[in-house]
Amino acid sequence: QGADVLLVTPSADFFAEPHVDCLIGYAKVFHQAGIKWTVSSYASEAANFAMFIGSQEQMREVAQRIWQAARDLGVKRIILGECGHAWRVAYSFWDTLVGPFDFLDPAYPMPMHICEYTDDLINREKLRLNKAANDEMTLTFHDSCNVARATSMGGRPGGQFEIPRAVIKAVCNNFHDMADDTIHEATFCCGGGGGLLTDDLTELRVKGAKPR
C-alpha cells in the first residue's frame, strides 16, 4: 500500500528471458519519473489466458483479481505491461467484466498501456534519453494482432500503431518499419497467441512466421 500505480504485467516478465528486460525497463521509467509503483502477488498475471479458450467466466475471475488488488492496495491507477492478450482483455472487456473502476483517480485513463504512459512522459520531457546509446542496433516493430485489430491507445484511432513506434523512435536513431502489407491491421500472427506458444506447437508456429 502507499503506491500510486499498480503495474500488472505478464508473468513471464518475472522469470523468463528476454521478457525480464521488459520489467527492468518499466522500473527504470517509473524510477526516473519519480512514480511510486507496486506489483501484486495476488494479481501477478496480466495475460488473461481464459481468452485462449473462450471462457468469459474464467476471464471474469482473472480480471476480478486485478480489480480487487487495485482496490485493496489503494492505488490511483492501473498500468498494463506489454502483452497483446492482456491489453485486449483490459481494453475491451474489463469495464463490462468487473467494472466499474470508480475507486481509481478519474484524472487518468483506465486502463493504461505502458507505452501510452511512457509516450506521455517523453512528450512532457520527463525522461532523459540517449538515442546514440542504441546506435549499434537497427530496430523494427511487430504489431500484435490482438492490439492491432481489437484495441486502440491514446484515445485516438491508430494510436495502437503510432504510440509504440513513437516510443521506439525516441530511444534510437535506426528504426525501420517492415513491408506495408505486414504491419498495422495487416500484421502477421507472432505465434504467441491462441495457445500457439506451447512447445508442442513449435513447428506450426515456425511455419506461421515464414511469410515474414
Residue ranges and their predicted role:
Residues 1-212:
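Iron-sulfur cluster-binding electron-transfer modules in prokaryotic oxidoreductases
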